[in-house]
């Protein structure tokens, strides 16, 4: 899934999908691009959109607006942005703890090249050299 910033189209699996312009050199990847999924974690079922981020060494399942269990805890991807570089992503991330939802670094910040930035009052992290792809998984049951 690649962003063509000139035509503002997102190409995935041979399909071209328009991308909403958020601000200069930044395009919001809309939720409709990913599959609507129901995710069951710890007796709670969330409805959201499933993404997979792949690198040369790792693969991460991410759920927009819901939570995914990782070795770092439960993470919520609030929004996914693409910068003007085709394979750079900016992730807005929170961690679900016993004390509620709190901002945190992306769990893979020791794996990717991550730079902290602030966009629209959110803590954001630029994750380099990754590719965002839509996954076809229907349901994850972690119980």
Question: What does each model-found stretch correspond to?
Answer:
Residues 1-143:
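Autoprocessing domains of the Hint superfamily
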């Amino acid at each position: 899934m690649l962003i063509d910033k000139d035509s503002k189209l997102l190409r995935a699996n041979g399909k071209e999908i328009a991308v909403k312009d958020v601000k200069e050199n930044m395009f919001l990847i809309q939720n409709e691009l990913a599959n609507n999924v129901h995710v069951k974690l710890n007796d709670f079922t969330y409805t959201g959109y499933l993404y997979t981020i792949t690198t040369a060494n790792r693969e991460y399942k991410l759920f927009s607006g819901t939570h995914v269990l990782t070795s770092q805890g439960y993470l919520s991807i609030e929004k996914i942005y693409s910068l003007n570089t085709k394979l750079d992503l900016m992730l807005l991330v929170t961690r679900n703890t016993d004390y509620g939802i709190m901002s945190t670094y992306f769990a893979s910040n020791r794996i990717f090249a991550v730079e902290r930035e602030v966009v629209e009052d959110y803590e954001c992290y630029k994750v380099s050299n990754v590719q965002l792809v839509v996954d076809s998984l229907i349901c994850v049951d972690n119980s």
